[in-house]
Amino acid sequence: MIDPVTHIVTPSNDEQRQGRSDGGMQLGLEDLHGGGGGLGQQKVSGMAEGTDSIVDVLTNPSSSVNLHSNILSVSTNVEEGQGMQPAAIQGGGTAAGRRFSSVPISDSPVGCGQHGMGTASTQVPSHGSTANLLSMGNPVATNVQVCQRMDEVSARLIVMEETVNKLLGNIDAQQQQIASMRSESMEMLGSLMKEVRELKQQVPVLDDPDNNEKDKFVTDLLNSITNVSSNYLKKVSSRNLQRFKRQRDIMSTSDLPSLGNTQSSSHFMQDLVNPYASTQDFQSFTVLKDKAKEFTLNPTAINKRRRLSAQPLNTLQMSQDQLQQQRGSVQSLISIPTSGQKNANFGPQLQNYLIGLQNIPMSEAEKVSSPTVLKQFQNSTTDPDLKTGRRNPGLDFQIGSGDDENDENDGASGEDEDGYLEDDEGYRSQSQRTMSSEDDEQFTGGNQGEDEAGPRAAGRNPKSLPSSIVRRFANSGSQVSVSGTPETERLVLKNNDKYDKNTMPAPNTKPRAVLASNPEDTLTDVQYTMVKAPDSVRAIWDEYTIGVGGKPSIRQLEQTYGNKWRTKRNKKTFARRKRIYKFILNGVRNGKSESEMIDILESRRVYRTEDNELKKRTIGWLQQSLSGI
């Protein structure tokens, strides 16, 4: 039955009577075995100690009390108490219920009994004597206490389960939050990568290997233009400076012999310089000299400047007053005494200088007899050979060293007709360039006729100087250099009386290269062929190294004849193809093979159209792109 106050299950009257009878029987058995009252008292005290130990174990699992011994002593004490003092047992149970009244106890006695008996039976299976004692006694009080502790443990487990459930809920919430943050971070990363790719596409790539070839081509093109421009400026500047120098030498007095401190010398210089300085030609040269400093390259006007430079200077137009002044100056110079050691050689030198002045007519009264060339000059009006052969009045006469042959072609152009430099022999001396200047001139029918005529043409030329004048110059003891416009040939006379009129060059003919007289250099039997409209770089290179159709190669012609084999034809073709020759030779000189250099040129021809098609540019375009090499 259940106590209404403590809710503790207590045994009924029948169970108490049954317990007392069992207790009496047990006590009788103990007396028979000689246990006596002392043994019963010991069991009662052991029962109390066992109950406290069970409570201590249930409340404090870490206690070191032996649960097995406590259960054994409790069961023994309960059996003795139920048989001898039922009221005390009942009171003890009531007290025990009051002691643990704060612990919630299950309302189901059946369930409690089941849990309690199950726990008791599992803890004491190995001791047969203890099981016999429990089965013989009344375990109601023990079951009640065990059920209370089990209920308490169950309540604690429920609290722990709720706490664990809350913890798991928090963990799930955190995992969901982490997953959401991860998804947001992935979306943010994707957007950032997309923006970075867009920025990367907008930024120009400087180290793109596809653009290196284009950059190299543009650089080569700019370098070629710069080289062509600089070479052209040097040629034009040197030509203009040479022309101005020759005109200034006309007015210079450094080459004139010393005339002493006579009054006639000052009058002579004034009378000689003033008439020419007042002319229009002298002023035009001064203006041209100033303009030369501000020269600007105009490639389209190359041929125009050539034509202008090829024109001879205009003949000086003198008035009648100027002629009278010059005539008086000549008469005053004739009357200058030439005796004395200082001026012993003055007469012939001055007469040689005046040989290039205007042919001034003089009256018979003004003429004086003179054994020098001046008399020949005065009488030249009646000499048809000298009259027809006199030079331009704007000529430059230099008395002194006559070794001016190297200045003959200072202004000669080394350019071909397209305006690009053709340095056939590279860096050569000035004399070598003079001999090969024919290669840089425009060949016409007249020039070719002059070349075929040979040196004998000078002897048949009616404009050649008479032999008497030449001998007088040779015997005068002076060394005279006569020069004219850049296109006329200079006459150099030295102290040698073995000059012959057949060896004198014509005054108004252009300089020409005299070839050797051996049959090899006359190029009469040379047969060669150049490829017409080549379609590949390999064909041009084979033409240079091997030859076409068994004919001599270009390299062989260059090594054997120099530039003489192409003076009359194929000049432009060779000048254009020479750029390809030089490009390949420079690569071979730097350690590359001929095939590699040819492949480089072929790859330069390849380009891509708007329709993304690969095509090749022409050989002419390739040659033009290599200008300046």
Swiss-Prot record:
Residues 487-501 have a biased composition (Basic and acidic residues). Residues 402-425 have a biased composition (Acidic residues). One of its GO terms (biological process) is positive regulation of ribosomal protein gene transcription by RNA polymerase II. Residues 475-486 have a biased composition (Polar residues). The keyword Transmembrane does not apply. It comes from the Eukaryota. InterPro entries: HOT1, TF_GCR1-like. Keywords: Activator, Nucleus, Transcription, Transcription regulation. GO terms for molecular function: DNA-binding transcription factor activity, RNA polymerase II-specific; RNA polymerase II cis-regulatory region sequence-specific DNA binding. Residues 1-43, 378-511 are annotated as: Disordered. The keyword Ubl conjugation does not apply. GO terms for cellular component: nucleus. Belongs to the HOT1 family. Required for a complete transcriptional response to osmotic stress. This is High-osmolarity-induced transcription protein 1. The gene is HOT1.
